[in-house]
């Protein structure tokens, strides 16, 4: 049954420009956005969930077609992206979006072989691709500056001495940026070293670290609660929900920094969150594409408000001034780090 559903989805993506009779008269059926998501699935607060929301809203508002693809494996998703990006669909303006950096390596190889189409009718947009190519468009959402601010504020907290960063896999650019930014910011206000735990070192699958909420809840959070760590920073996708669940059930044992969205509503032990507004970012990309001004490489950073550090309500009076005082230095450090 799953195989049949996959075939139907892929068929819709490949031939959707011919499906005109089902669309209302005001609908621009010759313009479509196809987004290939990671096989991890989506929820409202996940990066994929935000992108799905943004794409749904902007395509509805512009009355253009939106075709999401949910592969069962990364291999299947990468093959779908390569096939779509390698076919110029005449008579249909098409934007193909790779929503997950896990596809970057495969797409880089595909581009280097000259197998990606870049025409007025077909363009490929990669989110956080770790390479540049004339036939590929990249939207980069940098983590360094906002994580630098988070590290600086964490180091100023009197009850925070030992911090651990949980990362899913340091092969991902934004994860490396977030890790390094936090460590650099923390070292500015406190001399203690920051511990880093990489989930990819215990998994055969490089993507498993994004989906270990049960391990986080049943094992890793208990380790933190023993007093080894006062604060954790989980840059590991869905895995963060295991830590937040433990925080809710055992308040006051350690702080968890929210990542991706404002997560203060899930636990009082979230002092601040590193937020990326991916719904707005992907909408901006679609509008640029529709207006024929899509940039080959665009950065959606802290200064423009595409990402930000959001302080939880009960900590605002204490931490907002810290966030403001370190803002300029964080952005300058990010510029230097990126070079």
Describe every region a protein language model picked out:
Residues 27-29, 33-54, 58, 67-78, ...:
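Extracytoplasmic "Venus flytrap"
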Residues 90-101, 125-127, 226-237, 257-259:
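Periplasmic-binding protein-like
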Residues 284-339:
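Hinge/cleft segment of the Venus flytrap/periplasmic-binding protein
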Residues 139-161, 275-294:
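Hydrophobic alpha-helical segments within soluble ligand-binding/sensing domains
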Residues 13-16:
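C-terminal motif of bacterial Sec signal peptides marking the signal peptidase cleavage site
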Residues 117-141, 261-269:
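Flexible loop/hinge segments that line or gate small-molecule binding clefts
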Residues 55, 148-193, 297-318:
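An alpha-beta-alpha
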Residues 18-20:
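Bacterial signal peptide processing site
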